[in-house]
Amino acid sequence: MRKVAKLIGISLLALGLAACDGETKDTKAATDGAAASAPAGQQVSLLDGKLAFTLPVGMADQSGKLGNQANNMHVYADSTGQRAVIVILGDKTADSLETLAKRLENTQRARDANLQVITNKALDVNGVPLRQLDSIITSGGEKAYSSVLIGSLNNNMLTIQVTLPADNQQQAQTEAEGIISTLKLKQ
């Protein structure tokens, strides 16, 4: 599962670096009516409160081990590393959110021919347009549920990835939606 976490981290980093050349504009924003219940856990606040969400019980800040303030990567994971939330802030891009999501999907597909895309949709969180790409990825014979949110916040490109074991896809999807439903953004 460490390989999956590394693969996901590298994919997100590559996406962030590939999209460092302009301003993101996307006019296709939909409201996400996810009815997933919010998990009880630790409240996380970044960018002076402009980005906040709730971690599920059992996850803790691992940024000192895998990321730091200098590289704008924040990592929250459980003790096994199988359940993780990764937040990356990068430079804005001129590419649309749809283009960025498609590029991410193509990158994941190049690494995993068996990639299963569950969702690729537009959503809106507190007036901030985002793109959500949910998929099942396989690495080292293990499957993981990945939910990636891409958007623009505070003159940064924002990428949030929730990774969970995909042994039970419905449970993983519900837990990911629960985390996403706690997301609060302020421009």
Indicate residue ranges for each PLM-predicted region.
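Bacterial N-terminal signal peptides that target proteins for export
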Residues: 1-9
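C-terminal motif of bacterial Sec signal peptides marking the signal peptidase cleavage site
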Residues: 16-19
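N-terminal "mature-domain start" segment
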Residues: 28-70
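Soluble non-cytosolic domains of exported or imported proteins
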Residues: 50, 94-99, 166, 170-174
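Secretory pathway targeting signatures of secreted, lumenal, and periplasmic proteins
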Residues: 52-97
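Surface-exposed amphipathic alpha-helical segments
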Residues: 59, 158-187
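Signature of long, low-cysteine stretches enriched in small and polar/charged residues
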Residues: 105-151
